[in-house]
């Protein structure tokens, strides 16, 4: 057992809590998949390294320890003085490695929310979280024996430690509640994230051509569905830590792993071939013109239909072809400006039918190294292949739900991004303010809900350029943004991120700046 990770409620600030959560995440991280931290692969985890403990205290004399299973970041036991209590579903090895010098007892319920809520006689939505709740939990668990109250306090600790380690959205909510000294109850968005952690983790790790095997339905804070079916979906950036599900096929295996371990390790299936829409510029869909499947018919951008229809549905085949109604998305040639057509897969030149969909929403033809592009901003424009410049008109997102993800965006000092005419700056967050609502489109643009013809745009391609609202019809590289799991909002073309100028919101300026990861470059979608 190395250093115990500690958090004390005494003199706690949102900063001390943030440091605690970051230390916990670091201890739990086993690697990266698609750039997102993931828990260790259980097959490579030795039992003696499987558990860690976290010390939670109110003072020098009042503290408990929570035992966490590294393979799922879950609380499996707690220690109070020289007694320890294990949840009924704790792995058998837990008591061999956790709190060994204590008298060990088994609780008569397991750690699932279903069981805990049943015993607590309250749902998660009814149980307030925050510093006060954590103080009470620590002092009660020190000596309390009432099952109902144990269950209730464990619900508090699990969410403020385990769930917060898993999600930036949840650690943010707790941080704000500590800073403002107000309790909060989990909303629909938070509950849906907690309930879908394994689904989201699996979606990311099993993704094929940037696409989840199954859509994951989250909820927004006002309980509207948020359907996530692509790695490029902007909500994926709230994941701080994934459950290990499987290694992506042909992932570069670390040479340090012993062969036998790698063979035992679970590899994701590569057989999966999703059929999805492909949303792009202005939220339009890749569409076979006029439903015509004759060879050479052009592919256009058209508004996504209300119903899923064949000429907007594409199967992402494992042979790297993209097919509608059995025919292949095919480039007419390998020169910039060549048009993209539907063609019989067997008679087309094979290389002209191969596409790779990158994690950043780029669809590229490997032979020509040209990318799928919607040069026209109007409906019905023919799609072509062009030199890759990471333009907004070259950004795509797969999935059957191509509607924009509408959310507020919080940043430095927990302030929210706000549109003001053609400017954008930070203001106190207010869910009811239209000017703080942003529509995140399939093309990577960020648009003010007040006028979705206006996109967040960096004025220039150089460090320090202000970010303002400009017409989306330009389809520029300076209008395409990627929400990354490190919290940055990243511009692919410029390799820079959104930055609150000099960490001073009173300057009322958000600028383009190289990434350094300080708080003035960290953003979060608030659902």
Swiss-Prot record:
The active site is at residue 163. Residues 272-399, 402-526 form the Ricin B-type lectin domain. It comes from the Eukaryota. Keywords: Disulfide bond, Glycoprotein, Hydrolase, Lectin, Plant defense, Protein synthesis inhibitor, Pyrrolidone carboxylic acid, Repeat, Toxin. PROSITE patterns: RICIN_B_LECTIN, SHIGA_RICIN. The modification Pyrrolidone carboxylic acid is found at residue 1. The A chain is responsible for inhibiting protein synthesis through the catalytic inactivation of 60S ribosomal subunits by removing adenine from position 4,324 of 28S rRNA. Abrin-a is more toxic than ricin. 2-beta repeats lie at residues 452-491. The lineage of its organism: Eukaryota, Viridiplantae, Streptophyta, Embryophyta, Tracheophyta. The keyword Hydrolase applies. This is Abrin-b. 1-alpha repeats lie at residues 282-324. Disulfide bonds join 246-268, 285-304, 328-345, 416-429, 455-472. It comes from Abrus precatorius. The B chain is composed of two domains, each domain consists of 3 homologous subdomains (alpha, beta, gamma). It catalyses: Endohydrolysis of the N-glycosidic bond at one specific adenosine on the 28S rRNA. 2-alpha repeats lie at residues 413-448. GO terms for biological process: defense response; negative regulation of translation. 1-beta repeats lie at residues 325-365. In the N-terminal section; belongs to the ribosome-inactivating protein family. Type 2 RIP subfamily. Gene3D superfamilies: 2.80.10.50, Ricin (A subunit), domain 1, Ricin (A Subunit), domain 2. 1-gamma repeats lie at residues 368-400. GO terms for molecular function: carbohydrate binding; rRNA N-glycosylase activity; toxin activity.
